[in-house]
Design a protein with these regions (language model features):
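A charged alpha-helical hairpin associated with nucleic-acid processing machineries
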Residues: 105, 185-188, 204-211
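TOPRIM metal-binding catalytic domain and adjacent DNA-binding surface shared by DnaG-type primases
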Residues: 1-62, 66-68, 101-104, 211
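RNase H-like polynucleotidyl transferase catalytic core
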Residues: 130-135, 180-191
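Phosphate- and divalent-cation-binding pockets in alpha/beta enzyme and binding domains
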Residues: 120, 170, 192-193
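Short, surface-exposed amphipathic charged segments that create phosphate/polyanion-binding patches used
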Residues: 58-60, 144-149, 192-206
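Phosphate-handling DNA/RNA-contact segment within nucleic-acid enzymes
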Residues: 6, 49-151, 166-167
Length: 211
């Protein structure tokens, strides 16, 4: 667990990166359907002047893990064709993304894979949402966070990889094992939340919520 000084440092870094968002990064995010308001709310930024420990992320998009107490983690994403596509600071522990939405007055919560998809569901579509960074990052204590919700929706990516794996469906199955009352919403073949929003609009999700 981070102490107050560490949270302040990460929050300051996130705000610095947000203020340094490059034209290229902004164009990339807008191409994913994110508005200026959403980009600002989620403190998305560019690593132009990295703090200690973030040097390898220079030039990448910064995605802060925000909580009511401040930023507790950071993930970075390339917007070019280089590798690795994503980067975590060494030694950083991974929790749920966007736990701020767990504090919203809502009887419904959505769970999906990945940060950008979570931002789309929460910030663009308007469904309170949290994100999991893959099957291995679903923790045994996470189910306790959802006990108060009347409805839990798992928006499961349906994107088959070159090796034949379907990580989104694997994650949905894993979550369902711990949260049996959760509903799995299967996305169209070879899509994720972001792609569905861009192709079909917010109504695709809202119609399934109303079903």
């Amino acid at each position: 667990m981070l102490n107050e000084k560490q949270r302040i440092s990460l929050t300051d870094a996130a705000e610095r990166y947000s203020s340094n968002l490059t034209t290229q990064a902004r164009s990339y995010l807008e191409g994913r359907g994110l508005t200026e308001e959403v980009i600002s709310t989620f403190l998305l930024g560019s690593v132009v002047d990295p703090i200690a420990g973030h040097e390898l992320a220079t030039g990448m998009i910064s995605i802060p893990y925000r909580t009511p107490a401040g930023v507790v983690g950071m993930k970075f994403r390339r917007i070019d064709d280089g590798t690795p596509k994503y980067l975590w600071p060494t030694g950083q522990k991974v929790g749920l993304f966007n736990v701020i939405d767990l504090h919203k007055p809502s009887d419904t919560i959505a769970i999906c894979e990945g940060e950008i998809d979570t931002i789309v569901l929460s910030g663009v579509v308007g469904i309170p949402s949290v994100g999991v960074a893959g099957v291995s990052q679903w923790k045994p204590w996470f189910p306790k966070l959802f006990e108060s919700y009347g409805r839990i929706l798992i928006f499961a990516d349906n994107d088959v990889k070159e090796d034949g794996r379907n990580p989104g469906q694997e994650l949905a199955k894993r979550i369902k094992e711990d949260l049996d009352r959760a509903e799995i919403i299967h996305l169209p073949d070879n899509t994720d939340v972001n792609e569905v929003m861009l192709q079909y609009g917010n109504d695709w999700f809202l119609e399934r919520m109303a079903a």
